[in-house]
Swiss-Prot record:
Belongs to the class-II aminoacyl-tRNA synthetase family. Type 2 subfamily. It holds the Pfam family tRNA_anti-codon. The misacylated aspartate-tRNA(Asn) is not used in protein synthesis until it is converted by GatCAB into asparaginyl-tRNA(Asn). ATP binds at R213, A214, E215, R221, H222, V223, E359, G407, I408, D409, R410. The record marks H26, P84 as: Important for tRNA non-discrimination. This is Aspartate--tRNA(Asp/Asn) ligase. The gene is aspS. It catalyses: tRNA(Asx) + L-aspartate + ATP = L-aspartyl-tRNA(Asx) + AMP + diphosphate. GO terms for biological process: aspartyl-tRNA aminoacylation. It comes from Halobacterium salinarum (strain ATCC 700922 / JCM 11081 / NRC-1) (Halobacterium halobium).
């Protein structure tokens, strides 16, 4: 390994210390006899000050540098009020590790916006921009914190197939794949496998994986390949137990980001605070009443909210100090595995979590009685015979259970304050993009 200190670990308190850094040449400024070289690594930027009178050979090497060359620099740290971050490096050794042979097609060192399509085409360059790199550093810290919360609370991580003979949610938005001599599809959701595992005795589980939706869309909220954080737990009394888990884990995640990713938040200009108060839990009917009474907005679909409705509900509750809100009791007409509310022919124990005006997750209590489950499948036009691998798990005693699937990409979009979900994904996939 090349000897180096990460730039984020360098502080003015290190004045007088010798150190070595390595990274890309972010910016060059020649003042005649003094050359300022801003070096950028994965954690930050540090100013290197080369002086012709002090180190003529090194200065000559520095004069030959180009933007994005990879360098290794050894020298003495000097505290300076004029330097970015209050400290700079007086170099004694400068090695060019790798030369940049082409001029980058994207401006990396300056705050100049390229259109999103160009940024995604040149993602290997775009990720070098500090603002883009901050998104994925934040994402890494957020998902590490969320995963840790589930490990600490006795959940087990599982892996389920991303190839299957049928989709958990049915419909036409499945990607068919060639699988030997059989018909197969990319996974819409690990839902059926999560329930099979709960029935098998793995009663607190989570999975970080991908789901695929063959939908033709053109919005800032959708992509074809989705990163998901799926959760399922057994022995629940009702869907509120599931919401409790999601609320506590999300609050922990946001707190970790606020405490450990402030550099990234500052780079992104995202003003993030921890939602300490309980997340409000309102019924689906109450949500529609708020939209009608406060905003004169009525979603066209009587059984769902629309994008505008979610945004308006976000504004309504953020004004009251609640960036997150659960909407509970959606009409039960789409998914056979969701449990109905006793004595109510319409509502289900389904919920959505809205955060900063966007749906992050859907979840609820599942149906664990095989007779009711089979009847609901037939009511919704699903042939139970095609899901025998799933139904067989319910013949041997299944605890009441529930869970949810959280869209990781949407969560990062909201934490980072991004306009488009594709900005939160390293290599997004949509109907028009299959590379890089």
């Amino acid at each position: 390994m090349l000897e180096r200190t990460y730039i984020e670990d360098v502080t003015p308190d290190d004045d007088g210390e010798d150190t070595t850094i390595a990274g890309h040449v972010h910016e060059l400024r020649d003042l005649g006899g003094i050359l300022f070289v801003i070096v950028r690594d994965a954690t930050g930027r540090l100013q290197v000050v080369a002086k012709e009178d002090d180190t003529p050979d090194l200065f000559e090497t520095a004069e030959g540098l180009s933007s994005e060359d990879v360098v290794q620099v050894t020298g003495t740290l000097e505290a300076s009020d004029q330097a970015p971050g209050g400290v700079e490096l007086a170099p004694t050794e400068l090695t060019v590790v790798s030369e940049a042979t082409d001029v980058p097609s994207i401006e990396i060192s300056k705050d100049v916006d390229a259109d999103l399509s160009t940024r995604l085409d040149e993602r290997h360059l775009d990720v070098r921009k500090p603002s883009t790199k901050a998104v994925f550093s934040l994402r890494s810290k957020a998902m590490g914190a969320m995963t840790d919360w589930f490990y600490d609370n006795r959940f087990e991580e599982v892996d389920t197939p991303e190839l299957s003979t049928a989709g958990a949610e049915g419909g036409a938005d499945l990607f068919p794949v060639v699988y030997y001599d059989k018909e197969a599809y990319l996974s819409q959701s690990p839902q059926l496998y999560k329930q099979i595992l709960v029935a098998s005795g793995v009663d607190r589980l989570f999975e970080v994986g991908h789901a695929f939706r063959a939908e033709d869309f053109g919005t800032s909220r959708h992509v074809s390949e989705i990163a998901m954080f799926d959760v399922e737990l057994g022995y629940v009394e009702d869907h509120h137990d599931v919401m409790d888990v999601q609320e506590e884990s999300l609050r922990h995640t946001i707190r970790h980001v606020v405490e450990h990713a402030q550099r990234e938040l500052d780079e992104l200009g995202s003003d993030l605070s921890v939602p300490e108060a309980d997340f409000p839990r309102i019924t689906f009917e109450e949500a529609r009443e708020i939209l009608a009474d406060e905003y004169d907005h009525v979603p066209e679909d009587d059984n769902d909210l629309d994008t505008k409705g979610e945004r308006l509900l976000g504004e309504y509750f953020e004004e009251q100090g609640h960036p997150a809100v659960f909407v509970v009791g959606y009409p039960d007409e789409k998914f056979y595995y969701r449990q109905d509310v006793d004595g109510d022919d319409v509502a289900s124990r389904k919920f959505d979590l809205l955060y900063r005006g966007q749906e992050l997750s859907s979840g609820g209590q599942r149906e664990h009685d095989i007779e009711r489950l089979t009847a609901k499948m037939r009511e919704q036009g699903v042939e139970p015979e095609n899901f025998e691998f799933y139904l067989d798990a319910f013949r041997y005693g299944v605890p009441p259970h529930g869970g949810y699937g959280l869209g990781i990409d949407r969560l990062i979009q909201q934490l980072a304050g991004l306009d488009n979900i594709k900005e939160a994904i390293l290599f997004p996939r949509d109907p028009d993009r299959l590379e890089p």
